[in-house]
Design a protein with these regions (language model features):
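Bacterial N-terminal signal peptides
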Residues: 4-13
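Glycan-recognition and catalytic cores of secretory/periplasmic carbohydrate-active enzymes
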Residues: 16-423
Length: 423
């Protein structure tokens, strides 16, 4: 969503002047446009009610502050993820006003909050207004509204100051946060942030925060997640900080870093036969912290080997490669995504008329076949490159069929679903 919207907002500057279109008579708006305005109003009303109920006089969220991947600081801000996007789409000023004060309160609340049993958040879950050190699955979730805010108020001085600082954590501009190895072009740990990379084994407390009486599962799910050394494709989510810093300031160093880091990942994927590796060792080799296994790694291809979930290889890759393509127009940044999708379909299974793709890979090969075909990634690839070859598996996509004039009722049906979510 974020990459697609930014393409729409920014790509026009790179195009030749379009033909003049004269609009000189009023027409009735289509039904979907009226429904969209009503939907934005309903969201605004719901947001105001939610703010009144769950934000206190300090602009703190009414909750028990916890650290970790179960219910950490990111989950608080996920509640407000779309508010800055809704404003950018034409929503009420109240979205922006509420977000601003909630964000400021959030930064104070979780800078004050402590997780004493952790290695990196014992003196504050946030440090310098940023997560002390955690994975980009969660850091990225907590920053979505912040990143979309660039579309709302690009000249906001405090935003510019923060986005420069946050991007600098990944460019070694802060000596206390040596997250990036510029020689090997890696982020040095799955846990990284304003206090730098965690290079020692991650404990269940580093992952799950303080123990909660009667809830042992809070830590059980992380008992096999100690090895976080080296780079992981989730870290490509950090490209969004460099992207926002570059498009708002024009400073070349941010663009250079993003393209260097995303380019290194592109080259690794292509050298690995088009499969996205889920660990790059501290020596720069594929699978270097997992015995040379490209599919090793926490939140990687072989994580939790008895199931089909919690393999987050695609999330950062989709973001980082998409932003690199947006900045350059170089299709080589899209090719790793294309190749990965092709590799999955090459080993597909079919059951009861359904296509199943592998979600996991281990010593035994591909496994964990499910119906997840990564249509959202395939849709991005097609919309970025507009190559009909990328429509091979997307024939039934409702949005693309609408754009092709074959699914006129889609917008109303989609918004009906949104109205139900609000209710």
């Amino acid at each position: 969503m974020r990459i697609a919207l930014l393409f729409c907002c920014l790509a026009a500057s790179a195009l030749a002047a379009p033909p003049l279109v004269r609009i000189d008579k009023a027409t009735s708006p289509p039904d979907w446009a009226l429904a969209e305005r009503a939907l934005l109003k309903a969201y605004a009303d719901a947001a105001a009610e939610f703010t009144d109920r769950y934000i206190d006089s300090r602009n703190f969220f009414k909750c028990i502050e916890r650290w970790g991947g179960n219910d950490g600081p990111d989950d608080v801000m996920e509640t407000f993820n779309h508010w800055t996007l809704l404003y950018a789409l034409g929503g009420a000023e109240s979205f922006l006003e509420q977000y601003r004060r909630i964000w400021e309160g959030h930064l104070i609340q979780f800078t004050m909050a402590r997780a004493p049993s952790t290695q990196m958040a014992a003196n504050g879950m946030y440090y310098k207004e940023f997560p002390a050190s955690f994975d980009w699955e969660h850091t990225g979730e907590g920053l979505q509204a912040f990143l979309f805010y660039a579309l709302d108020a690009p000249a906001d001085a405090s935003y510019l100051q923060r986005v420069r600082r946050f991007a600098g954590f990944y460019m070694n501009e802060d000596p206390g946060a040596p997250n990036y190895d510029p020689k090997l072009k890696i982020i040095r740990s799955l846990h990284n942030g304003s206090r730098g990379p965690l290079l020692t084994p991650a404990t269940v407390y580093d992952w799950g925060g303080e123990a909660v009486p009667g809830n042992p599962a809070r830590h059980e799910r992380y008992k096999d997640a100690a090895n976080i050394r080296g780079d992981q494709p989730l870290n490509l989510g950090a490209c969004s900080l460099g992207f926002d810093a570059y498009v708002l300031t024009g400073e070349k160093k941010y663009r250079d870093w993003l393209l260097e880091y995303a380019g290194a990942w592109r080259d690794r994927v292509m050298a690995n036969g088009g499969n996205i590796p889920t660990n790059i060792g501290l020596d720069g080799t594929i699978g270097g912290e997992w015995g040379g296994r490209w599919y090793g790694g926490t939140f990687g291809w072989n994580f939790e080997p008895t199931g089909s979930g919690r393999n987050y290889y695609m999330r950062g890759a989709r973001t980082g490669f998409g932003e690199a393509f947006l900045l350059t127009g170089d299709p080589s940044f899209v090719e790793p995504l294309r190749r990965q999708i092709a590799n999955l379909y090459a080993v597909r299974q079919e059951k009861d008329g359904r296509i199943l793709l592998p979600q996991k890979h281990g010593d035994q090969g591909w496994y964990g076949f499910t119906g997840n075909q990564y249509f959202e990634v395939q849709r991005d690839i097609y919309l970025w490159l507009m190559d009909p070859a990328d429509l091979k598996w997307l024939g039934g996509d409702p949005w693309l069929r609408f754009l092709d004039g074959k699914n006129p009722g889609y917008p109303i049906r989609a918004m009906e679903t949104d109205f139900e979510q609000i209710r």
